[in-house]
Design a protein with these regions (language model features):
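Short, well-ordered beta-strand segments in beta-rich or mixed alpha/beta enzyme
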Residues: 2-9, 39-70
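Short, low-order "capping/linker" segments at domain edges
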Residues: 92-102
Length: 102
């Protein structure tokens, strides 16, 4: 299962600052049962916009995560709420179809 969201930096906050904090929070979140990693992709032509993809074993695993268990993760998420526009794009199944090349 993939949880995908777009992140746009507000004025005065950089992608690098976001990514540094995101990596720190991800280290804690990845200790959650069912967590399978996260990826950040910078949007071509819009360097202050990222696509984030969180990989989970299932929707139930993601729904069960508790970000409040870590004061540091909670603080990072609260800061991101002030410094970024975060737009959830949705929850997606694993790929059903794949093209060639990988």
């Amino acid at each position: 299962m993939k949880y995908i969201f777009e992140v746009r930096m507000k004025d005065g906050y950089t992608v690098e600052e976001y990514a540094e904090a995101w990596i720190e929070a991800s280290r804690v979140i990845q200790q959650t049962p069912g967590a399978r990693g996260t990826d950040l992709h910078r949007k071509i032509g819009e360097p202050d916009t990222l696509l984030a993809i969180a990989h989970w074993d299932s929707k139930a695993h993601r729904d069960a995560k508790d970000d409040s268990r870590s004061a540091r993760v909670k603080a990072i998420l609260e800061k991101h709420a002030r410094t970024c526009e975060i737009t959830p794009l949705g929850e997606f199944e694993e790929p059903e179809w794949r093209g060639g090349g990988r």
